[in-house]
Each structure stands twice: as structure tokens, then as C-alpha cells.
Curated annotation (Swiss-Prot):
Family assignment from sequence similarity: Belongs to the sprouty family.
Protein name: Protein sprouty homolog 3
Further details from the record: The gene coding for this protein is located in the pseudoautosomal region 2 (PAR2) of X and Y chromosomes.
Annotated Pfam families: Sprouty
SPR domain segment(s): 154-260
UniProt keyword terms in alphabetical order: Cytoplasm, Neurogenesis
Species assigned in the record: Homo sapiens (Human)
Keyword Cytoplasm appears in the UniProt entry: yes
Tissue-specific expression: Widely expressed; particularly in the fetal tissues. Expressed in the brain with expression the highest in Purkinje cells in the cerebellum (at protein level). Expressed in the myocardium of the heart.
Length: 288
């Protein structure tokens, strides 16, 4: 009986022989070492000779050992996958470092910065830049044509009128200027809006200049404004305030304009000045 049981047990194939037809990968599907030793070592066979095996107990114990082998098998597979992932990450990191080392220039040819850079200089305001430009307006090396009567430059940027200062507010949506303050303060903006919606001609400028004396429906505009002034009395303050604004504009222009302001140039001659040269002596006057 013992010899028959031993022959039947030897006919049972081990698990590695059952899976030999499948292409195995040493890095992923490596068989567990404890299970291989348990199936291939002769000590297990010797112990089976010593123990009394029966035909009823052998089929129940064998699947139990096979299930233990299957339970132990995923652990090395998981470890092998984690080791592969770690090796791939190390190789990727090393390649990235080599790439950065090849791109980054060597510090041997560059100076080493040892001090913390200070805060950047804030850009100057437009008014300060304009003031510097106007202060340098009297320098003869920066202007080409000088008037002989007043000694000032006659180029177009210098002789242009200087408007009153203005700025943009609300993320550059609202223009804050003397003109806009005058329109909103005297309710002229309401008149402009009314004329804009009542006008049928797209080329009509009555909405832009409602107080002009132009031939474009002048009588109708002034009559409508006279009627609206009964409900908006602040419209009566528009003309006096407009005159005050014009005087302020003239005063600001006389103070800030660096160019020539001569009205007539009948006996004046403009001359060209080279940079770095001394002031020329007074030239002879000749008629133009």
C-alpha cells in the first residue's frame, strides 16, 4: 500500500512544470523561493514516507499547499514591479541631471554674484519726464532751430501748446481731465446724450459740440438747451466755467511751453546749431 501511494505521489507534477509552457519573465513572474524549495527538496518526500498517507487525505492536502504557493507568489511580483519602477525613476533622474548639466553653462567664465541685488528703481511719472524734457529745452545742443528774437526753439514739438494734465482711472476706462470734469459738473453730458439719441444723421456733430454756433441746426440746439436749463439749472454755469477753463489753459501753456511764442517772424532768421558748439553771435537780420 505504501509503495502504491508513493508511486501515485511521484506522478503528480510540481507547479513549475505545469507552467513551463508559459513564457516567463525573470523580472515580473519570478517563482517564489520558499515555494520552489518546498516542492523540489527531497526532505518533503522523506517526511511523506514516514507519515501515513491515505487516498482520502492526499487530494485535500495538495490543493492546500498549492493555494499557499499562489498566496505567496504575488508578493515577489509586487516587489519586482516596485524595484523596476524605482530603477526607472533613478535612471530618468540621472538622465535629466546629465541633460541639465550639459545645458547649464559652466560658472568658470562668469563672475560670481556675492551681493543681494537691491530693489529696482521705480519708473518716473509722466509729469517728471515731461519736466526734465522741458528743463533741457533751453540747451542749444538738443534743438536745431533757434529764434533770434526770443532765443527759443522753433521746432514743432517745442512750439506745440501744452494741454492741462489728465489721467485715466478705473483701469483706463474713465478719463479724468478738466474737460470731462466741466461736462459732468454742469450736466452737459446729459445734453450730449439727449442729442445723440435724437439725432438722425450719423455725420451730425451736435452731440459732440452742443454749444457751438455752427450752421448745423444752431437755433434748434440752443432752444432745446434753454428748455432743458429749466430742469437742469447747472447748465447756466457752463459758459462762465468754460471761460475760466480757457484762461487756466492759457496760463498753463505760457508756463510750460518751452518753444518760441513769437506771433510774427518778418525779420527773424532761424539758424541750425551743431551739437557741442558755443552760442553763435547775433546774425545779421534779413527779410524773408
Amino acid at each position: 500500500m505504501d509503495a502504491a501511494v508513493t508511486d501515485d505521489f511521484q506522478q503528480i507534477l510540481p507547479i513549475e512544470q505545469l507552467r513551463s509552457t508559459h513564457a516567463s519573465n525573470d523580472y515580473v513572474e519570478r517563482p517564489p523561493a520558499p515555494c520552489k524549495q518546498a516542492l523540489s527538496s527531497p526532505s518533503l518526500i522523506v517526511q511523506t514516507h514516514k507519515s501515513d498517507w491515505s487516498l482520502a487525505t492526499m487530494p485535500t492536502s495538495l490543493p492546500r499547499s498549492l493555494s499557499q504557493c499562489h498566496q505567496l507568489q504575488p508578493l515577489p511580483q509586487h516587489l519586482s514591479q516596485s524595484s523596476i519602477a524605482s530603477s526607472m525613476s533613478h535612471s530618468t533622474t540621472a538622465s535629466d541631471q546629465r541633460l541639465l548639466a550639459s545645458i547649464t553653462p559652466s560658472p568658470s567664465g562668469q563672475s560670481i554674484i556675492r551681493t543681494q541685488p537691491g530693489a529696482g528703481v521705480h519708473p518716473k511719472a509722466d509729469g517728471a519726464l515731461k519736466g526734465e524734457a522741458e528743463q533741457s529745452a533751453g540747451h542749444p545742443s538738443e534743438h536745431l532751430f533757434i529764434c533770434e528774437e526770443c532765443g527759443r526753439c522753433k521746432c514743432v514739438p517745442c512750439t506745440a501748446a501744452r494741454p492741462l494734465p489728465s489721467c485715466w482711472l478705473c483701469n483706463q476706462r474713465c478719463l479724468c481731465s478738466a474737460e470731462s470734469l466741466l461736462d459732468y459738473g454742469t450736466c452737459l453730458c446729459c445734453v450730449k446724450g439727449l442729442f445723440y439719441h435724437c439725432s438722425t444723421d450719423d455725420e451730425d456733430n451736435c452731440a459732440d459740440e452742443p454749444c457751438s454756433c455752427g450752421p448745423s441746426s444752431c437755433f434748434v440746439r440752443w432752444a432745446a438747451m434753454s428748455l432743458i436749463s429749466l430742469f437742469l439749472p447747472c447748465l447756466c454755469c457752463y459758459l462762465p466755467t468754460r471761460g475760466c477753463l480757457h484762461l487756466c489753459q492759457q496760463g498753463y501753456d505760457s508756463l510750460r511751453r518751452p518753444g518760441c511764442r513769437c506771433k510774427r517772424h518778418t525779420n527773424t532768421v532761424c539758424r541750425k546749431i551743431s551739437s557741442g558748439s558755443a552760442p553763435f553771435p547775433k546774425a545779421q537780420e534779413k527779410s524773408v
